[in-house]
């Protein structure tokens, strides 16, 4: 496995500035308990060797590997996205948040059943709660991991930090949380291509496609930031033409797995 350290933090800073924490809350403030037999989770050691962003730049003849990643769901748009992915026989990655309603839990199951990668994006998706302390982060993480296991039987080993691993929102050093995930055998993913659909003045579907295509041509491995929250109808509209454009350029569209080069703003192996 390879870790790609993204040297430029402009994208994550833009993401933090544009993405509201949740309705009525500032981004800067930011289940039922398990009663079953305690579970044993498979541990996967995070990759220890990294490649630079420069080494990830695509050259002539390189095949572009593109990983479509959706975060903030499930929502009423997630099913539509799954339908489109199925239509094109494309697998993606979903970094989900915690929800207890039957519809959302059915979507967790559908994501797993249809061969997509089920990742974690925190239970509450509220910065003020998640990043309040080491204990708060760990409690939030374990709550989501346990729920996904109980609902789907999947031991998720992939995580995306709300705001990314280099966010400036947390009052606790991000290295604390990275160290914890390393201990848990969990690999976290940032992104190196952004669709721009987190912005409050969201782009049109055509602009979303253009944003992605302008950047994926640069890299051997592109982890694309997309959102499947309830207000992201333009993302749904953009998905089919985006897949068609990626297919036309000869890209491989893949779900994150153990063979994926890891895109991280802060490398996991840089934390003791």
Please provide the spans of the model-predicted regions:
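Compositionally biased, intrinsically disordered low-complexity regions enriched in proline and serine
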Residues: 14-15, 29, 42, 89, ...
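Context-gated lysine
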Residues: 9, 19, 39, 65, ...
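Polar/charged alpha-helical tracts
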Residues: 10-18, 83, 106, 113, ...
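Active-site beta->alpha N-cap acidic-glycine motif
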Residues: 40-156, 245, 261
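N-terminal start-of-chain detector that recognizes signal peptides
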Residues: 38-42, 65, 90-91, 161, ...
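Catalytic domains of cell-wall/extracellular-matrix polysaccharide-remodeling enzymes
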Residues: 125-225, 229-247, 251-252, 258-259, ...
